[in-house]
Amino acid sequence: MTFLEEILAQKAVEVAEMPLEQVAEKRKTYSFYDFLKENTEQMQLIAEVKRASPSKGEINMDVNPVAQAKSYEAAGAGMISVLTDPIFFKGSIEDLREVAKNVAIPVLCKDFIISEKQLIRARNAGATVVLLIISALTEDELALLFKQASALDLEVLVEVHDRDELALAQKIGAKLIGVNNRNLHTFEVDIAVSEMVANDFSTEACFISESGFKTADDVNRVSKEFNAVLVGEALMRDKTPQKAAESLKVKR
């Protein structure tokens, strides 16, 4: 069983037990898509709160999510990503709720979303952007969840790992497309994935390169084709996350 298969099997159990919440008022912040379109001179940063991962194990279990997020915001991050998976990433929806209460910028719910219940829960907790991972969904499931998220006035970051998945993301009209440099079946990371997939960019979407970034030189590799990078582990391991985040803001 691959990492992804194991995660999805557990996620089905988690979602089956999850209550269906009533839709509450949406948190007010700016559109991340509009922000990226308006701020093109620099590579923008999605900075992540992540305690652990299936491949690396514990990364920073003692982190204060709010303090970490506020450091990112002070560094000029355009959005905070919060892992909410409790089993494999040691996150929680409460982490997201607390972060969203304490920052002004958009918050991304980073999880393996397979149900509308998760979309509503994320919105109610303060997320204004949600992640849909193409490799975790059938084409019909992706289309339905994309429609449901849009109906909830959530922005959708559609994650791809290869050219076929990119074609599907562009076909459904995704405005935010993330290229994950991590293979979710093996969890191996290679920034060259983004460099390769970028050859097929053909829409008015904004593009985010995800995973594997540790230095400004890493970010420079994708700065021409991408609008932003998503960085988690490198920032979570650094004792001075604000400085670490600032160091990744390079010119495009």
Swiss-Prot record:
Pathway: Amino-acid biosynthesis; L-tryptophan biosynthesis; L-tryptophan from chorismate: step 4/5. It comes from Listeria innocua serovar 6a (strain ATCC BAA-680 / CLIP 11262). It is an enzyme of class 4 (lyase). One of its GO terms (biological process) is L-tryptophan biosynthetic process. Coiled coil: none annotated. This is Indole-3-glycerol phosphate synthase. Belongs to the TrpC family. Keywords: Amino-acid biosynthesis, Aromatic amino acid biosynthesis, Decarboxylase, Lyase, Tryptophan biosynthesis. The lineage of its organism: Bacteria, Bacillati, Bacillota, Bacilli, Bacillales. Transmembrane segments: none annotated. The keyword Iron does not apply. Its EC number is 4.1.1.48.
